[in-house]
């Protein structure tokens, strides 16, 4: 074979190897970014479940109790007691 044919084949092999390495690195970076986003979503879901849902429950329960007992208030004392 002619020497320039060997050079072209070697160049093709090297370029294929470089392209494969670049694709693998790009795939790893994308995987790391998607994993970080998934972790952030899981943390936000945990904060929602552990912090906000109980707070909304306590707030709604207290508000309902307040409105329920507003109807059953004792009357005000007479003016001469003051």
Curated annotation (Swiss-Prot):
Transmembrane region(s)? 17-37
Q: Which Pfam families match?
A: CoV_E
Localization, per the record, is: Host Golgi apparatus membrane
* Segments in the Virion surface topological domain: 1-16
Q: Which PROSITE patterns match?
A: COV_E (PS51926)
Q: Does the keyword Transmembrane apply?
A: yes
UniProt xrefs under CDD domains: MERS-CoV-like_E (cd21533)
Which Gene3D superfamilies does this entry report, sorted A to Z?
6.10.250.1810
GO CC, one annotated term: host cell Golgi membrane
Q: Which UniProt keywords apply?
A: Apoptosis, Host Golgi apparatus, Host membrane, Membrane, Transmembrane, Transmembrane helix
Transmembrane helix as a keyword?
yes
Cite the ranges annotated as topological domain Intravirion: 38-78
Q: Which InterPro entries match?
A: E_MERS-CoV-like (IPR044379), E_protein_bCoV (IPR043506), E_protein_CoV (IPR003873)
User: Signal peptide: which range, if any?
Assistant: none
One GO BP annotation is: viral budding from Golgi membrane
How is this protein situated with respect to the membrane? Single-pass type III membrane protein
Similarity section: Belongs to the betacoronaviruses E protein family.
Q: What does this protein do?
A: Plays a central role in virus morphogenesis and assembly. Acts as a viroporin and self-assembles in host membranes forming pentameric protein-lipid pores that allow ion transport. Also plays a role in the induction of apoptosis.
User: Quaternary arrangement and interactors, per the entry?
Assistant: Homopentamer. Interacts with membrane protein M in the budding compartment of the host cell, which is located between endoplasmic reticulum and the Golgi complex. Interacts with Nucleoprotein.
Put simply, this protein is called Envelope small membrane protein
Naturally occurring in which organism (per UniProt): Bat coronavirus 133/2005 (BtCoV)
């Amino acid at each position: 074979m002619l020497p320039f044919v060997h050079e072209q084949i070697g160049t093709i092999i090297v370029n294929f190897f470089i392209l494969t390495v670049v694709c693998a690195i790009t795939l790893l970076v994308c995987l790391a970014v998607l994993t970080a986003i998934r972790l952030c979503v899981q943390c936000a879901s945990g904060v929602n479940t552990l912090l906000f849902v109980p707070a909304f429950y306590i707030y709604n329960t207290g508000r309902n109790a307040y409105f329920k007992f507003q109807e059953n208030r004792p009357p005000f004392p007479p003016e001469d007691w003051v």
